[in-house]
């Protein structure tokens, strides 16, 4: 009797292997399995945004002009959110609101949900692309982990916040001036600048910018001479064995400046990763809190004293009055369907007026 020992082999024409070979082939633009999610979603999100900013009005949802066709420019055009009355409807083209009518779908704000959802999945696909490529070339996955910060901010601001409110109407519209309006809304209705999570986010983003500037300048300052003056772009190559700059010199310099300095490149670069990503995640957590209408810091004692004493005012109490003004003016303008009317005497006035 003959016993054959060997490994079971798949059919040569296995569909998965064929797809895997084609998707992960070495080409100018890597596709990969993540590309099946990234490329279609990014295409539809960008295409929807360009279509909306070029042709689609916001008259039916916000009472505004928002397209190039109506006279807007790059800074004022936007794909605006659906009307407040549509709540959290996905606004599918074939749904009960538009009933397959593309023009009606655009008028109702269907492009916003289209761009928001495809944009979110495109960002997730881009993160998966970094995971996939890192695994293919045997890198650690910190690029993908870092990109989770922008994804967290996008999802919290554009999806989770309006889900916690009465509808998509209260999310930001996709446009430059529209985002600015949303920032003013956040300040007026949530006192966002006094929120500790916003403070951590600002510290993370600006701290990362500072670290990046310091790091780049320090490396440029400590380049080894190579016979070509200060320019090392032609003298050094990617596979060189020696270092391009002197970490020891950089350490001595900053030790004299601050009294402390990074002595380890790994800790230095991890810190440059940790600061901005943590800041973005903290901001995202703060926005999730705002979705639930959690309040920022309140210094009630100062408000009470300012109300009782006309001569007492702080920057905090002035900002609270400013927030009241934002709410009074923005609510009437931004939610015309509510028919809000504020008489002159109820609009906030500071003690100095």
Swiss-Prot record:
EC number, UniProt record: 1.10.3.9
Primary localization class, coarse: plastid
Entry-annotated residues carrying Phosphothreonine: 2
Binding site for Fe cation: 215, 269
Membrane topology according to the record: Multi-pass membrane protein
Keywords for the protein's UniProt record, in alphabetical order: Acetylation, Chlorophyll, Chloroplast, Chromophore, Electron transport, Iron, Magnesium, Membrane, Metal-binding, Oxidoreductase, Phosphoprotein, Photosynthesis, Photosystem II, Plastid, Thylakoid, Transmembrane, Transmembrane helix, Transport
Localization (cell): Plastid, Chloroplast thylakoid membrane
Disulfide links within the chain: none
Transmembrane segments annotated in the record for this chain: 41-61, 125-141, 153-166, 208-228, 279-295
Claim: Disulfide bond is one of the keywords in the record: no
Sites bearing N-acetylthreonine, chain numbering: 2
Entry binding sites for a plastoquinone: 215, 262
Sites where the protein binds pheophytin a: 130, 143
Highest taxon listed in the record's lineage: Eukaryota
Catalyzed reactions: 2 a plastoquinone + 4 hnu + 2 H2O = 2 a plastoquinol + O2
Record-linked PROSITE patterns: REACTION_CENTER
Cofactor remark from the record: The D1/D2 heterodimer binds P680, chlorophylls that are the primary electron donor of PSII, and subsequent electron acceptors. It shares a non-heme iron and each subunit binds pheophytin, quinone, additional chlorophylls, carotenoids and lipids. There is also a Cl(-1) ion associated with D1 and D2, which is required for oxygen evolution. The PSII complex binds additional chlorophylls, carotenoids and specific lipids.
Pfam families listed in its UniProt record: Photo_RC (PF00124)
Gene Ontology biological-process annotations: photosynthetic electron transport in photosystem II
Residues given in the record as chlorophyll a PD2 binding sites: 198
One Gene Ontology term of the molecular function aspect: chlorophyll binding
Misc: 2 of the reaction center chlorophylls (ChlD1 and ChlD2) are entirely coordinated by water.
PANTHER family linked: PHOTOSYSTEM II D2 PROTEIN, PHOTOSYSTEM II PROTEIN D1
Quaternary structure (record): PSII is composed of 1 copy each of membrane proteins PsbA, PsbB, PsbC, PsbD, PsbE, PsbF, PsbH, PsbI, PsbJ, PsbK, PsbL, PsbM, PsbT, PsbX, PsbY, PsbZ, Psb30/Ycf12, at least 3 peripheral proteins of the oxygen-evolving complex and a large number of cofactors. It forms dimeric complexes.
Similarity comment: family membership: Belongs to the reaction center PufL/M/PsbA/D family.
Name listed for the protein in its UniProt record: Photosystem II D2 protein
Species in which this protein is naturally found: Lemna minor
Gene: psbD
